[in-house]
Amino acid sequence: EFHFNRYLTRRRRIEIAHTLCLSERQVKIWFQNRRMKWKKDHKLPNTRCDLPTLPRPLPARLGKHKL
């Protein structure tokens, strides 16, 4: 079903839920998760998520404290 249409009508969601003995909510969430996975798998290879970068630690001062 997902290969033909990534979004379901309520009527189709009810039909699938009844056929698979699942709740409508379970079917809805499965389709939501599958859409997210599809988006993730079909990203362009050159695009990447820019994660916030952490500040680099300051370099330790050599020779500041002698033993």
Curated annotation (Swiss-Prot):
GO terms for cellular component: nucleus. One of its GO terms (molecular function) is sequence-specific double-stranded DNA binding. The keyword DNA-binding applies. PROSITE patterns: HOMEOBOX_1 (PS00027), HOMEOBOX_2 (PS50071). It holds the Pfam family Homeodomain. InterPro entries: Antp_homeobox_Deformed_sf, HD, HD_metazoa, Homeobox_CS, Homeodomain-like_sf. Residues 1-42 bind DNA. CDD domains: homeodomain. The keyword DNA-binding applies. GO terms for biological process: anterior/posterior pattern specification; embryonic skeletal system morphogenesis. Transmembrane segments: none annotated. It is found in: Nucleus. Keywords: Developmental protein, DNA-binding, Homeobox, Nucleus, Transcription, Transcription regulation. Belongs to the Antp homeobox family. Deformed subfamily. Sequence-specific transcription factor which is part of a developmental regulatory system that provides cells with specific positional identities on the anterior-posterior axis. This is Homeobox protein Hox-A4.
